[in-house]
């Protein structure tokens, strides 16, 4: 059942549930997989559920109920929660490995997983070359996080140019005049800033650097936008694997700054910053500000390729991002891919509460219908779609 997420003052076309919704420096270890057990039986090269068919998502013919995926760490918290609830509801098992967007793209291209996940959308040309489709699942936000004594979550204000200058190494101390000018009520230390960044290929990095390139000509000219970049502060900073690794480093390194998906900041009780957006307003990360940034017409985005950073909407969070799923259009294992679509069909239908609880923003019914229509391009050897969404 799909319904209104929030009373958000943004117009809605083909966008979000928020609108018009009907009913030391050793790499830290992290548990980066999400999996739920299932009661299954093997049928050919796929696994189908033996659960009683009390739900449209259970025990359907030619739909695998044991699927694997890999990729972005940005959505890992919601995919883990969805996986657990999907298992409880249907008996299906989803094993998702949080390895970074680059790894997810490589694995789906190599056909070693049933679906890939990336926060850096593939271009229409890249999708065509790889024989893939992509569709977004939720919108979230990339947030700067800091570890400064006495600075509470949301208290430190930064603008895009200052954030870029920190990661360029131009601003190296917390009491730099540019930071102090925006934070007259804070006592900031005369201490060196340690930058923390991703060491793996990352969609979170893609969106972070895309934002910095839009607000800083120096960043655009010297570093650019990508899932991996040459960090100007690498000699004095630290690289963490996944959002998990960045969170861990910032948590234990005083006077550090990093960037993670908002759920990681909340789950780890970390201090995020406020950011000045393109409209000139200092905003806090929240479902409302993410929704404001994602208020776009997805029907006009070829291949659903869209980067939503630096929105000019008045209350938009400046580093908002959609996260995407990748599957093959002509899969060698159609039952497995049907299982993937079944899982995300369930998530679109049943998973809004989970998403909202973690401050991700689900999509509107209209947008979801558009995404599901794209699934018709995923066909078996008989030329027919491998999956028909539940009614």
Task: Report residues per predicted region.
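Flexible loop/hinge segments at secondary-structure junctions
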Residues: 20-391
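Bacterial N-terminal signal peptides that target proteins for export
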Residues: 1-6
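C-terminal motif of bacterial Sec signal peptides marking the signal peptidase cleavage site
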Residues: 14-18
């Amino acid at each position: 059942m799909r319904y209104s997420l929030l009373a958000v003052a943004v117009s809605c076309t083909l966008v979000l549930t928020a609108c018009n919704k009907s009913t030391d420096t050793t790499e830290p270890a992290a548990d980066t997989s999400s999996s739920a057990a299932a009661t299954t039986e093997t049928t050919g090269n796929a696994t189908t559920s033996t659960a009683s068919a009390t739900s449209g998502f259970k025990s359907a013919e030619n739909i695998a109920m044991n699927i694997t995926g890999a990729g972005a760490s940005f959505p890992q918290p919601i995919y883990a929660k969805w996986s657990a609830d999907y298992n409880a509801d249907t008996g299906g098992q989803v094993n998702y490995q949080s390895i970074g967007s680059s790894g997810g793209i490589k694995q789906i291209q190599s056909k070693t997983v049933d679906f890939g996940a990336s926060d850096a959308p593939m271009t229409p040309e890249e999708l065509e070359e790889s024989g893939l489709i992509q569709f977004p699942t939720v919108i979230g936000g990339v947030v700067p996080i800091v570890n400064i004594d006495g600075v509470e979550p949301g208290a430190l204000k930064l603008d895009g140019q200052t954030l870029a200058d920190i990661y360029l190494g131009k601003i190296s101390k917390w009491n730099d005049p540019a930071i102090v000018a925006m934070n007259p009520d804070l006592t900031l230390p005369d201490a060196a800033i340690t930058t923390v960044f991703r060491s793996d290929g990352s969609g979170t990095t893609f969106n972070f650097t895309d934002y910095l390139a839009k607000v800083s000509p120096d960043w655009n000219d010297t570093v650019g936008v990508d899932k991996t970049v040459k960090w100007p502060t690498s000699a004095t900073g630290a690289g963490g694997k996944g959002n998990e690794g960045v969170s861990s480093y910032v948590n234990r390194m005083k006077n550090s700054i990093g960037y993670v998906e908002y759920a990681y900041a909340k789950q780890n009780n970390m201090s995020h910053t406020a950011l000045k957006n393109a409209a000139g307003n200092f905003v806090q990360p929240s479902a409302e500000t993410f929704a404001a940034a994602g208020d776009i017409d997805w029907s006009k985005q070829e291949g659903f390729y869209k980067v939503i950073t630096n929105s000019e909407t008045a209350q938009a969070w400046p580093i908002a991002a959609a996260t995407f799923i990748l599957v093959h259009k002509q899969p060698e294992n159609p039952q497995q891919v049907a299982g993937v679509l079944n899982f995300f069909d369930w998530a679109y239908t049943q998973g809004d509460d989970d998403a909202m609880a973690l401050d991700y923003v689900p999509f509107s019914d209209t947008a979801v219908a558009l995404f599901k229509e794209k699934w018709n391009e995923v066909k078996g050897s008989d030329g027919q779609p491998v999956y028909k969404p539940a009614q």
